[in-house]
Amino acid sequence: FNPEATAKDYPEVDLFGYLKTKKSENACKRAAVARLSNAISLEPYTGDMDFLTNMRLASQVKGLQNNIANVEIHHSLYSYTLTVDLDLVGIDENDGVSLSGKERAKRVVDLLNCIQHLYHDIKGRRENLAPVFVIGGLYEAKSPYFLNRIKLHKGDLNVALLKEVIENIEEPTLCGLLTGIFKNEDEIR
């Protein structure tokens, strides 16, 4: 990591923070202003397995025999939360950075646009984490209100729980969804 990289020139440094280290000096750090929670499966694991062998690797070593391996296969909808501290986007006191309101807004819009392409590579497979349901707003309190509040039961999204959370927030909240994903789509709308 180049210690000369600043939030002014690198949006990823601005949004996701950094730890700049130099030999014989204290580290300079910036906490992430955009935070993505862990992705949690909304559907149970059903025990699907893919059976593999290591034949290719074993063939490269004389005397080594191939082994069978099991890999879990899980297709599910996932819930994750993105929170962004809008007061800190484009502002970095460590490096004296203070971007214009227009540039700060652009960074947030760019981040939100990137989320539609979110995926996760794990154990040789790619998980599509592009949103099929989004809920949120601009809130005074910097709290991940919907973290662990998205629940799915037999294809139905728990709308009653979401309504309760929205009532407690008492600030405008918007949601959107892709057609054909949830059984209770009309209720969600």
Predicted feature residues:
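RNA-binding basic/glycine-rich loop and surface signature characteristic of RAMP-family CRISPR effectors
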Residues: 1-189
